[in-house]
Every structure is written in C-alpha cells, then in structure tokens.
Amino acid sequence: MLGKLDTWLTEHPKRKDLHGWRRFIVEFWFFGLKEARACLFAGLFFIAMFLVPKTGWLGISRYDLLLIFAVSIQAAMLYFKLETWDEVKSITLFHLVGFALEWFKTSGDIQSWSYPDEAYTKIGGVPLFAGFMYAAVGSYIIQAWRLFDLKIKSHPPYWLGTLCALAIYINFFTHHYIGDYRWYLVAFALGLYARTTVLYTPYDTTRKMPLLLAFVLIGFFIWLAENLGTLFGVWRYPNQIGAWASVHISKWSSWALLVMMTFTIVANLKHIKHTISVSKD
C-alpha cells in the first residue's frame, strides 16, 4: 500500500496547464503529503509517545513500551522495503550517537535533562528508546531524499563537512568544561554551506532553496516536537520539574546543528552520493 502511495506521490507527468495560484496550491498540497510520508517513523513514534499512558500498560512501563514500538516500526519499514539495510545501518549509527549524547547529558555531573519514569530498559538513567528520537531524524532525511528526489549543488568537500559534523558533536560534550563554541561552529557552517543549494521536487517541477535554510526549518520543527515531549512528561529539563515551561529557544540552534550532523552521515550513503555535486572551488 505504501509502495503505491509513494508511486502516486513521486511519479507525475509535466502539467503545463497549472499556473499561478492553482500551481501553488497543488505543489503545496503535495509538499505537505510528502513531508508527512517522510515523517512516517518520527510521526508514529511521537504519536505513541503521546498516547502511551504514563503508568504504562499491562504492567509494562511507558519507556519499555516505547522501545518495543520503535523497534517494531523499524522492523516493519525494513520488511516492507521502505528502508534498505544500508539505510538501517546509518539509522543504527544515529541511535548510537544519540544514545551516547543522552547518557552524557543525563549523567550525575551534568543533568541537562532527565527521564523521570522507571523502566527495565534504562541504562545509566537513559531509556533505550531515547536513541530512536535521533534515529527518527535520520529516517526523515533518508525518506525525504527519495520522495522529493533531492539533489545537492555546490556541496563542500566531504572531509570539510565531516570535520564540521565532528566538531559539532564534540562541542555538545566539551562545552560543559571548556566553553561553548556553538556560535563559532555556526559561523564556520555558514561559510561552509553558504553556496550549497538543495533541489527538490514537490510535484512535477524542481524547486530550490539554500541548504542552510533547510537545516534551520527542520531544527525548528524538532524544537516544537521537543516541547510536546516535555509537556507529556516523557523527559524534562530542570526548569520543568515544578511545572511545565517551554523549552528554551536556544535549543533550536542545537537541533539545527544536530540536523546538519545527521545530514552529513546521510550524504555518505552510497546511493545518495551520486545526487550530490561537490564544489570544485
């Protein structure tokens, strides 16, 4: 069924009869449908996060249920060939990278945020499902790449993109000890990706936008999702222990940087590299 949906979403003959506001509405509609389809893993996972009772179900804790649900979604996507083994390996890497960050950020000396519920599948205070929140970002980018027939123009040399991604990840740890170099990294990324353009096809015509803008927009929607996650008490920041408060807006920049790091991993997949044009300058 999803295969037929994907075919319907991606295979369109050129519509020369569409102009003006009619074309805008059709393209905007298909853009929204493709975005929703690309968010399949993330969407189902967050729906489960909001629907599973805080007290759990059938004697199984909420965090354990979320892990079972996340693994089931991932297995189903692989079984129905919505993701390849190569992509699953990358998503597993996102899970491990995210879990390591979660473990550090929730450790006794740091306590940037916490997971208040009990569970059998918690390691060092972090439930195993937490890594899937990062994997969901990777899954979204992989699915969007195919559905929108993404192509990247004027991408910086891969080694520079990898260096930037590593620096971003390391700074998430080291800023607790030697200062936060986030804005220096933002400046570096602005220079690195200033000319990089992403080409995407919402319906039958290719459009383009700055890649940096895509990072910022995706980061914003993750920030919104994080607000919902803390509202439902799945995890919480120190300022939310007494009563809920919105996640600080500064987290938006952190998520945008994490999206950039995730993009770098996805860009190194074999079947995606051929869609990327590396700048020769």
Feature names for model-found ranges:
Residues 1-281:
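Aromatic-rich, lipid-facing transmembrane alpha helices and their immediate juxtamembrane interface loops
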